[in-house]
Amino acid sequence: MSGGGPIYIHKMSADGTRLLDDGQKVYEGPVAEGTKLFKKDGYYYISIPEGGVGSGWQTVMRSKDIYGPYESKRVLEMGVTKVNGPHQGALVDTPEGEWWFYHFQSADPQGRVVHLQPVVWEDGFPVIGMDYDKNEVGEPMKVCKKPSIECNVTPHAPQSSDDFASDKLALQWQFNHNPANENWSL
């Protein structure tokens, strides 16, 4: 699959190292990027973040045939929340059978803040987050339960202060993109 605008499905070599055809266009929409393809219950699903980071939404399409035709549904948008974008995420399922959608929002100097939203399936499409404004499109939840997974990880609060005693920056000093190391020192 490829495309940052139109979405194409390609045949690939068995080892996944090269394309074997020019691809078949299966969708064209506004600023489609970060597309994901998966199969569930006999359907091919294409998850597409559309419309750009600031005001975008998440579309999910499904078809019994990988080349379509596809049914399309907007499944997540900013709506009445303050989470812009909900953008460039992915649907994931846990070993316990729960479904989740992780995505980011653009938070200017804080960079791209990651969110995790609960998912339920209704009529063959994911319902992501909560439909606060009752328009049949999910919206990001500010607070939700955490995934019910078996895990032996001790939770840690984020570090919020630094005495700069180390020769390396602590985790709270992560950079939005590529750090300009020449602009700081310890």
Where in this protein do the model-derived segments appear?
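Carbohydrate-active catalytic/glycan-binding domains of CAZyme proteins
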Residues: 1-186
